[in-house]
């Protein structure tokens, strides 16, 4: 007794099992997190080390090199990169996805602690920090006011908004963008300081001595004890202005005599505006695996409650909300599920033409789909675009087994058998076929489990959900479906009106197919050249279709990055960014929000468009319009970026090409030629390199002999320049219970050119004032401000933006060509960022594709007990791939992860049709028919089931191929590949498989 017979004999058991699947599925659905994609960012550990006053060369040789040397041996490292700059080095260790973040952090800490003995004694201890894979904000609350300063807004954002939002469940952290922290600014006048004989070091010492509060003990009496507190701290600008710096001949010199103190912003070289109004942005970062939509809803609710706590002249709005796109794209996919469900029901009814027979397989669809949510829950997945796409795809798949089972039982009832007996007989005959097609389909998804990197992590969830749905559907088809068929199906003496009207069409279809198949089998040799042409077509189209990681989506968001030449001032890049902002306002006056951010050397303008349904233009059209317009703004460089579908590197350009050499001189020599070729290449819209040799600097060469004679040491010179010019922290003060920095610096107007440095004085060991000009020589020079390593080599990374219509695959091909023309064998090249992910996913998908073919072949060989028969079925695969590529080529669809997964799926889908024909033909042969007659009868008898299951799969995916709205391009890519492959392969399979069968199938009669 098999499971189908058990279910027919015990209908309550079959019903209970189905209800349990539904119940667990619903529980899983209600507890799953919601996000856009699975987490695909690699674990990243950062190591930073400061060495005050050291230039990039010293940092590289004395700090970066020893640290890298030790870290390099840790297992599981994907890439090791570093940047050495004035006073600091930062090493970024990226691990493989399979490595646990905590383990990686502990390994790095261990290696760093071992390396510390090789570092300079007076450098700061290195710090190791984890970069959370999900640490990108999902939502920003913009705090604005027309009357208050950014300092006041920052305080409101920090004390009111941030404190409230941090308490929301599943929020990892809340940051403030554009924050202006209070500081006590000490502005110094070098001329007055020279007149009074005061140096910047004197001011630092005075602050240290006058702004101090130490524990002062207590007074103890017989009955009482009093704690003593020395009120040595200063809290206001007035107190700082009155601080005594020095006393000369009874004359007290205060800070106000040689400068002034004011309460101001610690960071004066940054700003942030939204729609032209200065603002600070409070951004919310979720915990890994959290439900992003629930967090966003909680933020909206909390902000509404907070309205009464905010001052009347302070308003808030939302700068961006990434969950809008997530909501919309998942809602679009959900509606696609319903559309697919309805279309599948219609196609089944049109073929079976009986509502009872239609209803039975259709019940399997919700059981399988709801059950899939329990699979997601057990596996720790989330509801995201990929798992929902898997659900859409399953609509057409899960019904196949139930259709075959129901039809087989129905045929027996029509012949006059009792429903109970028909159920047992029909289920027994089809039992093996259901099991074998299920194993075949699930086997296609096994290779995806072995895929590494980004694509592997992305599609593991997808493949698990489809495989889970198919397994549940076959279980339902073998248990609930036969039980239901025995209860619902009845023998009809007279067919319905609709059946009688449509039967001539189906009989005519059978006759046409029979005649055309007979004609084709007479000239069956045509099948061989058709197969060869198909393979050639695949080779040509595979290379012609452009490739990329994922199609670009309309996310209603565009970013323009601005960058000035090395050495440009903050004001220069600020004015340029404001020019770009004004240009954007003129091009898209109806934008929802335009946010500009500027810091020293670079800036960006982020444009949030209206929702897709509220505008008649696309994000891509706007981006192209802006790209053309900003070419006229030549004071600095600007580059338009549109966010890629996945990966955390949302701010970098798509092409990241790393040149590695053994010395920096080699890179300096080759980079201009390489970059010129990139600039001249029409594939790239813009290019830049991180390693610069054009940063202007003034080198202060100290005459050591002269300084020694005058009683001045090098440290005195360095400290005088540091405290006078660098805005160095001179201590801390407290205000309203919070700690803020004291920053000292010479007035901007008196340090705006190198000649101003000459007016700074220094005190020698005899207490005499000596003008700095007497001890030093100023030499203007250029040097790399930062030195880069990538995987232990000295490196330069060329970042390039792609021209309209170009893909990352084409960009990397062009880079490889330029590299082969320009570089000799002493150079090495590598990829980073999105480029590395793309290359790895391409090779990973090819591995999955080949493994899927091998697995299917081996499983079929085991099922048919033949190595020849599976080869016949495998011939359907090239037909399907050719169909997919033809549709992709004419539909202007790129070769991306979504379309490639569609192609891998086709292997299992089209193999099912071949299995039905070959297995039935083998049964006919074993019954005594010769090969030709057996395959002709099998193909004719299996025509309707094949057309019905193929049509249900195709119609289930039609809503994907014609998708609109948010996230449509991904759905279109997958839908077009599968629909195209299924359409062409279904038609050709009905002729090619019978023809090839007659040539190479196992002769079953001889075996008898």
For the regions a protein language model found, what residue spans apply to each?
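Extracytoplasmic/periplasmic membrane-proximal domains and adjacent transmembrane bundles
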Residues: 6, 37, 48, 90, ...
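Helix-loop junctions and hydrophobic alpha-helical segments within the transmembrane domains
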Residues: 319, 326, 330, 406, ...
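Hydrophobic transmembrane alpha-helices and their membrane-interface caps
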Residues: 24-36, 342-411, 418, 450, ...
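Transmembrane alpha-helices and their membrane-interface boundaries in multi-pass membrane transporters
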Residues: 395-409, 431-450, 457-499, 605, ...
């Amino acid at each position: 007794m098999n499971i189908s017979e058990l279910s027919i004999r015990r209908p309550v058991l079959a019903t209970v099992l189905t209800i349990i699947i539904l119940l667990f599925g619903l529980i899983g659905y209600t507890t799953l997190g919601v996000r856009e994609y699975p987490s695909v960012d690699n674990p990243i550990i950062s190591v930073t080390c400061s060495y005050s006053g050291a230039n990039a060369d010293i940092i590289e040789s004395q700090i970066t090199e020893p640290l890298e040397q030790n870290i390099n041996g840790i297992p599981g490292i994907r890439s090791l990169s570093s940047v050495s700059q004035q006073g600091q080095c930062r090493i970024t260790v990226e691990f493989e996805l399979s490595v646990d973040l905590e383990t990686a952090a502990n390994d790095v800490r261990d290696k760093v602690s071992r390396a510390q003995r090789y570092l300079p004694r007076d450098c700061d201890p290195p710090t190791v920090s984890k970069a959370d894979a999900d640490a990108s904000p999902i939502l920003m609350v913009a705090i604005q006011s027309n009357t208050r300063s950014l300092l006041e807004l920052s305080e409101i954002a920090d004390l009111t908004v941030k404190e409230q939002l941090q308490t929301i469940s599943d929020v990892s952290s809340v940051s403030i963008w554009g924050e202006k922290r209070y500081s006590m600014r000490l502005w110094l006048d070098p001329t007055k300081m020279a007149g009074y004989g005061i140096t910047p070091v004197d001011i630092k010492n005075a602050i240290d001595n006058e702004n101090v509060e130490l524990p002062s003990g207590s007074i103890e009496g017989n009955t009482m004890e009093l704690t003593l507190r020395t009120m040595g701290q200063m809290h206001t600008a007035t107190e700082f202005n009155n601080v005594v710096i020095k006393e000369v001949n009874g004359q007290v010199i205060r800070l106000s005599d040689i400068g002034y103190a004011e309460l101001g912003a610690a960071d004066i070289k940054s700003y942030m505006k939204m729609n032209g109004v200065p603002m600070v942005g409070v951004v919310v970062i979720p915990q890994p695996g959290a439900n992003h939509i629930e967090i966003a809803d909680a933020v909206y609710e909390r902000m509404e409650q907070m309205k009464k706590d905010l001052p009347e002249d302070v308003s808030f709005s939302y700068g961006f909300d990434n969950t809008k796109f997530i909501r919309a794209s998942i809602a679009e996919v959900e509606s696609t599920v319903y559309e697919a469900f309805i279309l599948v029901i219609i196609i089944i009814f049109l073929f079976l033409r009986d509502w009872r027979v239609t209803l039975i397989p259709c019940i399997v669809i919700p059981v399988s789909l709801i059950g899939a949510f329990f699979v997601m829950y057990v596996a720790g997945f989330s509801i995201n675009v990929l798992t929902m796409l898997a659900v859409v795809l399953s609509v057409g798949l899960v019904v196949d087994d139930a259709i075959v089972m129901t039809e087989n039982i129905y045929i027996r009832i029509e012949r006059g058998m009792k429903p109970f007996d028909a159920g047992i007989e029909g289920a027994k005959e089809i039992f093996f076929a259901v099991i074998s097609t299920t194993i075949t389909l699930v086997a296609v998804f096994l290779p995806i489990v072995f895929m590494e990197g980004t694509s592997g992590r992305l599609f593991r969830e997808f493949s698990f959900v489809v495989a889970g749905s198919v397994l549940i559907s076959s279980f339902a088809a073998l248990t609930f479906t036969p039980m239901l068929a025995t209860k619902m199906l009845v023998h009809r003496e007279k067919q319905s009106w609709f059946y009688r009207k449509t039967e001539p069409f189906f009989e005519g279809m059978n006759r046409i197919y029979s005649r055309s198949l007979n004609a084709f089998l007479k000239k069956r040799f045509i099948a061989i050249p058709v197969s060869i042409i198909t393979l050639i077509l695949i080779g040509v189209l595979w290379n012609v279709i452009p490739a990329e990681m994922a199609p670009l989506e309309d996310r209603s968001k565009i970013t323009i990055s601005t960058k000035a030449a090395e050495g440009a001032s903050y004001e220069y890049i600020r004015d340029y960014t404001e020019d770009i902002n004004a240009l954007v306002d003129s091009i898209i006056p109806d934008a929802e929000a335009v946010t500009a951010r500027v810091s020293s050397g670079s800036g960006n303008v982020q444009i949030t468009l209206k929702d897709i349904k509220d505008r008649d233009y696309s994000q891509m059209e706007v981006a192209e319009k802006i790209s053309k317009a900003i070419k006229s703004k030549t004071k600095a460089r600007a580059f338009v970026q549109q966010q890629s579908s996945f990966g955390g590197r949302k701010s970098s350009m798509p092409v990241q090409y790393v040149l590695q050499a053994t010395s920096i001189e080699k890179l300096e020599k080759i980079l201009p030629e390489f970059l010129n070729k990139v600039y001249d290449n029409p594939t790239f819209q813009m290019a830049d390199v991180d390693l610069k040799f054009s940063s202007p600097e003034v080198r202060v060469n100290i005459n050591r002999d002269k300084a020694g004679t005058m009683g001045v040491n090098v440290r005195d010179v360095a400290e005088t320049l540091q405290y006078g010019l660098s805005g160095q922290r001179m201590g801390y003060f407290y205000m309203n219970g919070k700690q803020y920095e004291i920053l000292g610096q010479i007035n901007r107007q008196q340090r705006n050119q190198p000649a101003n440095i000459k007016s700074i004085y220094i005190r020698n060991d005899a207490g005499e004032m000596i003008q700095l000009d007497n001890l030093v020589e100023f030499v203007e020079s250029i040097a790399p401000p930062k030195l880069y390593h990538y995987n232990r080599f000295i490196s330069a990374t060329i970042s390039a933006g792609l021209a309209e219509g170009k893909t990352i695959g084409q960009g990397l091909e062009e880079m490889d060509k330029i590299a082969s023309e320009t570089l000799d064998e002493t150079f090495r090249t590598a990829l980073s960022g999105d480029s590395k992910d793309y290359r790895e996913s391409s090779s990973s998908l090819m591995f999955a594709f080949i493994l899927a073919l091998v697995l299917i072949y081996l499983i079929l060989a085991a099922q048919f007990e033949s190595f020849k028969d599976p080869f016949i079925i495998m011939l359907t695969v090239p037909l399907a791939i050719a169909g997919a590529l033809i549709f992709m080529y004419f539909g202007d669809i790129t070769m991306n992860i979504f379309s490639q997964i569609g192609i891998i799926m086709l292997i299992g889908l089209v193999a099912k049709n071949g299995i039905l024909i070959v297995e039935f033909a083998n049964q006919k042969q074993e019954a005594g028919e010769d090969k030709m007659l057996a395959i002709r009868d099998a193909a004719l008898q299996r025509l309707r089931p094949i057309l019905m299951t193929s049509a249900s799969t195709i119609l289930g995916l039609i809503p994907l191929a014609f998708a609109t709205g948010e996230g449509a391009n991904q759905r279109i890519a997958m839908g077009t590949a599968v629909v195209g492959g299924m359409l062409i392969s279904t038609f050709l399979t009905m002729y090619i498989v019978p023809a090839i069968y007659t040539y190479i199938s196992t002769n079953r009669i001889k075996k008898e």
